[in-house]
Amino acid sequence: MLSSIPHGGGTSAEIEARRGISKEAARLIKAQTSWRRLDLLLAGNIKPGDVYATFTWDNAHYPKDRRDALRQWSLFRRKLTAKRRRCGKDLIAFWSLQRGDLGNRWHIHCVCNCGGETYEELEKLWGRGTVKPYPVERDKDGGFYTSIARYMARFRPEKLGQRAWSYTRNVRRPEKDSFFVDDNATLSVPEGCIILDRAERKTSFGEYQFIKYEIPNF
């Protein structure tokens, strides 16, 4: 992404316009919205063939409240982590505890690197209800993760301080690189990459460009 830097001088309207352009570009650079951040994390940690699953509770194990639901989920993650470690693998997982569909009952959406486990094994380890798993596949727009990220981040937390989604500590974070370019520079992606999204805005006071792309077989 390229972003102009506001310079001094000009009328108050011009200064405010330049600030607006820079702020808009910064919002895209930082990907501060919840689903965009999750989208980046999924892209760096989850691959096609991994699992996206919905975990539900039966009546016998249904949680008393949000805290109890997260406690039960933590116990399940410990069992799954231990199982994978016995096979020499680490668990990488992202999850969102939600309520609002499925009869307004608590349920958990999860994306994890458990493509090697059978679906029957996941349901046996869960042991509190049903597991509906699906293999992670390519989105219709060319990406793998955007639709999953949007869905998992769609519910707002019920209270201040609660997270819409969480993840294991061992996930890889996006790497950032910033540098100055000439005013007439044009963004281009590496050869062979697939462009998933592109945005550009230009006014008399500033401009930015944005390209989201996928590196095949990365």
Walk through the language-model features, giving the residues of each.
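Conserved, short, structured surface segments that act as functional micro-motifs
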Residues: 107
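Right-hand nucleic-acid polymerase module
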Residues: 1-104, 114-218
